[in-house]
Amino acid sequence: MNSKELVRNMIAFLNERHDMDCFTLRQRFAVCYGMSENEAKKVILELTMLQIFAENFGVEI
């Protein structure tokens, strides 16, 4: 899987689980992508910022 597909899959993972509390989401994201919860927290924040940027500028990820 290339990096573009990975980012798309991670964003899809987050969008599908929008009803989870942040603690559970961070735990499941960390397990799914093989990272620590602290790393997951940082990646989730970065993906959220990327998604907002893309929406504001009409860019498709």
Predicted regions and their residues:
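N-terminal acidic leader/helix
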Residues: M1-V31, I52-N56
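Short, charged early-sequence alpha-helical segments and their helix-coil boundaries
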Residues: E37-I61
